[in-house]
Amino acid sequence: EVKPNYDYLKPITLIHTNNVLEAMKVTIEKRKKELESPRSLCLFINRTDMILQVIEKLGLKKDSVVFCSSNSTTKLNEAGIKAVENWNIKEQKPFMFFTSRFYAALDIELKVQPDIMFVTEPYLYEYTIIDPCTDAVQAIGRFRNGVSSTTHIVSTNKDFPIRDEKGINEYIKASEEAYNTILRLYDCAPSLEFRNAYKAALDQLPFK
């Protein structure tokens, strides 16, 4: 187990809610009133379907850009939302959305320290769950000039499984085995439709 030998803790405002969208709306409106000078709000939401819903329902389309995988940019662009595959400061907008591929291995340098918002909605989008010990630390660390504030808006699901370290390791191992099994079937598929079916299954698995 790797443990840092320095203090890496960052202050985070935690907002627990049973209505994530409403909490985001209230928080964004409050921020707008309190903002003395313009700076971007960077939102980390690991599901493009949810990002699309948030942008449309909160009326943020003209002021937003989404940084996501190439598989998702087409869908978002067709919906009239600016979406790009790679980070570029020229794409900076008041609201910048990031999926998990931007949590690590990337330097984001902005002249003005942005506000950060993590969003977790396990009821509808399980993969939006943020790990405070890894995801949050890595994402905040992307901003080389620092951040102004960090907020985590989170809904909880009482039915979500709670695992100890042994359970986590077993789950990861089983997920990897399931992925590799379907991948072998995909590689040996006898027809295009078989490949499409296996590919759809691979895309739904938690292990990549």
Predicted feature descriptions by range:
Residues 94-116, 136-146:
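SF2 helicase motor core recognition
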Residues 24-59:
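Conserved strand-helix element at the start of the C-terminal RecA-like helicase core
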Residues 123-149:
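Conserved SF2 helicase motif VI
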Residues 40, 91-96:
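Loop/turn-to-beta-strand initiation segments
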Residues 1-2, 155-157:
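Conserved helicase ATPase motor motifs in RecA-like P-loop NTPase domains
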Residues 1-31:
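Interdomain hinge/linker at the junction between the two RecA-like core domains of SF2 helicases
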Residues 46-49, 65-83, 99-103:
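Conserved helicase motor
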Residues 168-208:
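The feature captures the C-terminal accessory region of ATP-dependent helicases
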